[in-house]
Regions:
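Secretory targeting and sorting signals
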Residues: 2-49
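Asp-box/WD-like beta-propeller blade repeats and closely related beta-sheet repeat scaffolds
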Residues: 147, 154-171, 175-200
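Extracytoplasmic
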Residues: 521-524, 557, 571, 589, ...
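Acidic, Ser/Thr
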Residues: 529-537, 617-625, 756, 848, ...
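Lectin-like carbohydrate-binding module/patch detector with strong preference for beta-trefoil
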Residues: 831-955
Length: 955
């Protein structure tokens, strides 16, 4: 969710114009982008190049913040210019054209990983039938937690994502009883990723729905997930979905919904009804995660953002490096995944690779891909794969600049001279595609040439953050959903905007409404604020507050007491001297106080490595609930990547241990981190609905690329072939610095930097708080003989602060360019202790016969204090007889043995709070085979389940 709209390791806000090498997908986002094009139903002149004058447009804020936005997912504009927008947790909101937001419905949903409420579409006949469509994951009887990676029976995890039609009541509330199930897409639940879920209509009233490949990308090295092993969870094989002509996943579906909610198949889909081994609903196939798309109603063309995988480099044994695409789809077809990407030629075809370690076969034939997966239920030979309209990776498409890769919506503007709207876009922009990018945070117009190719690309004014969805409204204005900067949840930057064309007229003022309290018991006194409200022309504003309980005020910052329980929308309207107005809403809950949630540990900014077992503690409190039921407290792990996040796993409890899986999807130099999201939903009180509160902490990798800084002064980024990930921080001169946040450095005692210098060298100091803050340690950077010649320099750290800080690396030396910094590593305290490792059975971890040969069996045995049962724990290494405890593989049942110490991840064991010992290479637990406690029981690794045969006491 690669390159998702879900939050990651902050590239945003660096203030630099130089590219970030890595990609931004979701999961989520979450998220991923989608779109497809339909059979041409009419003709339209190609768009002519047009320079956009930013001063001619105004970005009007309609809603902002978590209370009004939730976790923003998708939007749809109604005929009255009000906007429906969804949140993943099942909440549906409506924001009026004036900017007043209210919750109009809640749909029960299953919310593991990226699933939940996704897309929304408005029936073309809404004015008379008031129908809308939602795509969501119904709860069903799916087990909680994660599905197993291996096994023989995954039936409990079978689920569906549902396309359903609903009716809005006259007051715009959602009539849940009106639900009609239109179509269900079978899914494999309990594992991430790729839901898709966007909805649109063409001029003929056909409904289009995008679906993701429902496949796990995290164990494929950043290449294609085509793991055909019969004991693997089906989610590791995208051939069963995106490459399957008889499956609705990884597709764009096209149907005609009938009045009774049934549907028919319009002509021109990829497979005619009745074709064996196919589904007639399929319009476009071979898609990984078509998260956002838009249909150009004038031509029937679909413009779709398609997310790709994350491999940093191409591989002769695996396939091409990761890339993403904007696709222009004008007729039914296959777009390649999981066999081909980009140009969909041999050069960008994947290799038929045998998991887990080869061999590699030949490259797939993009002209006639063959799906021979045992999970394929469709045709063996697939339609030829079509090339992407625009493919890009890193800085490969100059007009898109550089940075993370996360293509999103791409609506087409169509000028209507008869439309009386005063804010419609000009005729000069007719036919232009308004492409949006989540991670790079831009909107650009693309001219479409007469032959359908992409023409001139121009910047379009945008002052929000990460674009989640966009569509033109009936007024000819562009409506944009801004995800904000959170990870798997909304935040203060989440917003809904309307971008208006108003080249010479009086522009609308912006209203900002806030309150010192938004929930509590009656009587509830609230102090309201209009701080931040403004007029673009600088005119004096007048203020009008409607508190939602029948009372009003004209004060700029009034105080009001609510005397009765209820849900109230306090609306501020500001008016400028020319009579234009803007509005903002604050939601007030009287009778049910929002809970508080605190993560007591780990601290925000704590260091981790993939494979770690991370113990956590959460404190939740609620005024009305009193004693907290810890089974209602949740902790989720979100894999952060650039400016998005992939929701990976959730478990319940006020305390526990989160197992951070080994990441097998992203480039090792990618900008990754962990987000821990603690959540509690109260029980509701005094007739008022439940309220959910989230709190998040970020964990930082011990080894990090220097170019992933948060802020900097004076430096630049350079491509260097010998650098990790191919990038360094360079042009470093005396007094320059880079900074990172957040960091909690408890237990850190050493710092190592990878550096190069063909300049004069210098010193690098580790500081906290500011560029002139306390120095924890300083290293001397020598002249290495070349900018591509790297060496490691290290220093011990002292006076390390407690708590969460901002980390600064400051640079000093003579004149001119000093050195480059590629990456850095923090070392943590590693107390050494020796003794037996005792299982829950009371027996000891034993080296068979005291043998020292590589491969000697490690087993359970009655404790006897022998040398072959004495283990030395140093950090995460376990040694006996001068050799290391080693996992022979990564699959369930891989033997645990004695082996020459080599520093590999297979010899790295992380102790969990529940007594588990987790192997860093596989993320699996040390296990007494068959749950036996007999002498001689072989020790193996197995998927962690918390059983007694996976509990160990270290010396």
């Amino acid at each position: 969710m690669r390159r998702y709209p879900f939050a990651a390791g902050r590239i945003a806000g660096t203030g630099r114009s130089i590219k970030d090498r890595f990609r931004a997908l979701t999961t989520a986002a979450l998220l991923v982008a989608a779109g497809v094009v339909t059979t041409v139903v009419g003709s339209s002149s190609p768009a002519a190049a047009h320079a956009v004058n930013a001063a001619d447009f105004q970005q009007v804020e309609l809603a902002r913040g978590v209370a009004e936005m939730g976790e923003p997912m998708t939007l749809a504009v109604l005929p009255d210019r009000s906007v429906l927008h969804t949140s993943r947790n099942g909440t549906l909101r409506r924001t009026t054209a004036e900017g007043v937001t209210s919750v109009i419905g809640n749909v029960p949903v299953y919310t593991h990983d990226e699933e939940g409420l996704q897309g929304i579409g408005v029936d073309p006949g809404f004015a008379t039938n008031r129908h809308i469509f939602l795509f969501y994951a119904p709860p069903l009887n799916t087990p909680g937690g994660d599905a197993p990676a291996t096994g023989t029976d995954f039936s409990a995890w079978k689920g569906v994502n549902r396309l359903a039609r609903f009716t809005l009541n006259a007051d715009y509330t959602l009539n849940l009883a009106s639900q009609v199930t239109v179509l269900e897409v079978g899914t494999d639940r309990g594992m991430c990723c790729h839901v898709g879920g966007d909805i649109d209509f063409d001029a003929a009233g056909n409904l289009y729905l995008s679906t993701g490949d429902d496949s796990n990308p995290f164990d494929s090295g950043g290449y294609t997930p085509i793991d055909e092993r019969t004991n693997r969870n089906p989610t590791y094989d995208a051939q069963r979905s995106a490459g399957n002509t008889n499956d609705l996943r990884g597709k764009v579906l096209r149907i005609k919904v009938n009045a009774d909610g049934s549907y028919s198949i319009p002509p021109g889909n990829l497979f005619a009804p009745g074709t064996a081994g196919t589904r007639p609903e399929i319009y476009a196939m071979g898609l990984r995660n078509p998260f956002r798309f838009n249909v150009d109603k004038a031509t029937g063309a679909i413009y779709l953002g398609e997310y790709g995988p994350d491999a940093g480099t191409s591989s002769s044994t695996r396939g091409p490096a990761g890339m993403v695409e904007f696709n222009r789809i004008t007729s039914a077809g296959n777009f390649g995944w999981p066999y081909c990407v980009g140009s969909n030629t041999t050069a960008e075809a994947y290799v038929d690779y045998t998991f887990p370690s080869g061999p590699s076969g030949s490259r797939f034939n993009c002209a006639a891909p063959v799906n021979n997966s045992p999970r394929n239920t469709g045709l063996g030979t697939l339609p030829a794969a079509r090339a992407a309209w625009i493919k890009y990776d890193n800085c490969s498409f100059a007009a898109f600049g550089c940075g993370s890769e996360s293509p999103m919506s791409a609506p087409v503007y169509r000028y209507d001279a008869a439309n009386p709207s005063s804010v419609k876009f000009p005729a000069a922009l007719d036919g232009h595609v308004f492409a949006t990018e989540f991670g790079r945070r831009w909107i650009k117009t693309i001219d479409v040439n007469a032959d359908g190719s992409a023409g001139q690309v121009s910047d379009f004014p945008w002052r929000g953050t990460q674009v989640m969805d966009a569509a033109f409204g009936p007024d000819g204005a562009l409506y944009v959903l801004d995800y904000g900067t959170g990870w798997g949840s909304g935040d203060a930057s989440s917003a809904l905007y309307r971008i208006e064309y108003n080249p010479a007229g009086n522009k609308a003022p912006t209203a900002r409404a806030a309150a010192d309290r938004t929930s509590g018991s009656a009587p509830l006194t609230v102090n309201f604020s209009s701080a931040g409200s403004s007029d673009p022309e600088g005119g004096a504003l007048s203020y009008s507050w409607n508190f939602g309980d029948g009372t009003t005020s004209t004060a700029a910052n009034p105080s009001h007491t609510y005397t009765a329980n209820g849900q109230f929308s306090a609306t501020l309207t500001v008016t400028d001297p020319g009579g234009r107005s803007g509005a903002a809403t604050v939601s007030i809950s009287v009778g049910n106080t929002a809970p508080t949630v605190r993560i007591d540990g780990p601290a925000n900014g704590t260091l981790f490595s993939f494979g770690d077992a991370v113990p956590y503690t959460i404190t939740a409190s609620d005024r009305e609930d009193g004693t907290i039921d810890c089974q209602r407290v949740k902790m989720s792990y979100v894999l952060g990547h650039d400016s998005h996040g992939h929701p990976i796993t959730t478990q319940t409890g006020c305390s526990g241990t989160l197992q951070i899986p080994v990441d097998g999807e992203h480039d090792t130099a990618a900008n990754l981190f962990a987000v821990l999201d603690a959540e509690y939903t109260d029980l509701g009180a005094n007739g008022q609905p439940p309220v959910t509160t989230h709190t998040q902490h970020v964990l930082q990798l011990r080894h990090r690329q220097a170019e992933h800084y948060s802020t900097q002064s004076g430096t630049a980024l350079y491509d260097k072939a010998a650098a990790e990930g191919g990038r360094t921080v360079g042009d470093i001169q005396n007094g320059d610095w880079i900074a990172f946040q957040p960091y909690a450095l408890g237990g850190v005692n050493r710092f190592t930097a990878r550096v190069s210098s063909a300049g004069s060298g210098g010193t690098l100091s580790v500081r906290t708080g500011s560029p002139t803050g306390p120095v924890l340690g300083t290293v001397t950077v020598p002249v290495t003989g070349g900018w591509e010649t790297f060496t490691d320099v290290s220093t011990a750290l002292s006076n390390v602060p407690t708590g969460t800080v901002t980390l600064y690396l400051t640079f000093a030396g003579g004149t001119g360019t000093l050195f480059d910094v590629d990456a850095y590593t923090f070392g943590t305290s590693a107390a050494t202790r020796t003794g037996p490792i005792v299982g829950a059975s009371g027996k000891c971890v034993d080296v068979n016969g005291g043998g020292t040969a590589d491969g000697t069996k490690v087993q359970l045995w009655t404790c006897n204090s022998g040398a072959n049962q004495r283990w030395t724990v140093t950090g995460s290494t376990l040694r006996a007889l001068d050799k290391c405890l080693d996992a022979a593989g990564t699959g369930d049942g891989a033997l645990v043995r004695l082996w020459t110490c080599n520093g590999g991840a297979g010899q790295n064991w992380i102790a969990g709070a529940n007594g588990s010992l987790v192997n860093a290479q596989s993320g699996k637990c040390l296990d007494a085979n068959g749950a036996s406690s007999a002498d001689g029981t072989q020790l193996i690794i197995w998927s962690c389940h918390g059983g007694t045969n996976q509990r160990w006491t270290l010396p």
